[in-house]
């Protein structure tokens, strides 16, 4: 009986040595990282509103049920100069905001979203004043007590351009239309749209411009005449929903 008990105790001790938490070093039990890490080029749009950019920080490792904390920091201009040696300019802190810079993960949380809000007016003006520079926001994760994946710890945002979206007709060429005398009503579709990806709900207003007709006739030596009011109709206000770049008038 004593010998049997000794064997059982020895077996139990041997098995405990091979449990996962004993095989994996403590620093790998929970590891934090940025989902879309690395260098990301970002185009901003002048819309009269702040532009937003979202990214996520994840908690992984051999035991992601553990709690964890991490902070989002920004490399200084001196650090960027030393790391890259090119004409990068770190975006001034008053040109943007972050909804949070510290992330505390509960046991059941595997990821947290972070949203950046950037001022296109301020960034665009800085780019115009210093056209040789590329403006960047070099973010990185840091934690006093938890591990960070060194390969996915940084998000280096480069501002590729600041554009003003424009709405226009998809075809601006003269399009002659022929109708038989005495017809009742005839419809024609005229395409219009946005020249960039549409992240907004755009309200478009349409009107007839007699001055444009006069200018066109004078420039091209034509004698086009405007249809009398009441002989045509169109929706003066049209919406271009988010996610849609073109539609018909």
Regions found by a protein language model. Give the residues of each.
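Acidic/polar, low-complexity intrinsically disordered N-terminal segments immediately downstream
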Residues: 14-113, 122-204, 210-215
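Active-site-adjacent structural elements in folded domains
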Residues: 98-100, 231-236
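Ligand-binding face of N-terminal immunoglobulin V-set domains in extracellular IgSF glycoproteins
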Residues: 113-119, 248
């Amino acid at each position: 009986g004593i010998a049997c008990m000794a064997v059982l105790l020895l077996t139990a001790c041997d098995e405990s040595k091979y449990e996962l938490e004993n095989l994996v070093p403590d620093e790998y039990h929970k590891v934090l990282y940025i989902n879309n890490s690395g260098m990301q080029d970002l185009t901003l749009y002048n819309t009269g509103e702040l532009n937003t950019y979202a990214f996520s920080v994840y908690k992984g490792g051999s035991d992601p049920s553990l709690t964890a904390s991490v902070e989002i920091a920004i490399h200084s201009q001196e650090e960027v100069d030393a790391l890259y040696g090119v004409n990068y300019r770190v975006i001034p802190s008053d040109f943007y905001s972050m909804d949070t810079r510290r992330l505390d993960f509960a046991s059941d949380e595997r990821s947290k979203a972070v949203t950046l809000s950037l001022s296109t007016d301020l960034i665009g003006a800085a780019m115009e004043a210093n056209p040789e520079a590329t403006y960047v926001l070099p973010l990185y994760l840091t934690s006093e007590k938890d591990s960070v994946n060194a390969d996915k710890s940084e998000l280096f945002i480069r501002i590729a351009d600041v554009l003003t979206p424009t709405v226009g007709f998809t075809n601006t060429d003269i399009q002659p239309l022929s109708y038989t005398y005495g017809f009742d009503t005839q419809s024609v579709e005229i395409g219009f749209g946005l020249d960039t990806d549409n992240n907004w709900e755009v309200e478009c207003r349409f009107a007839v411009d007699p001055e444009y007709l006069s200018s066109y006739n004078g420039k091209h030596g034509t004698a086009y005449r405007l249809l009398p009011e009441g002989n045509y109709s169109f929706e003066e206000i049209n919406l271009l929903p988010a996610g849609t770049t073109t539609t018909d008038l």
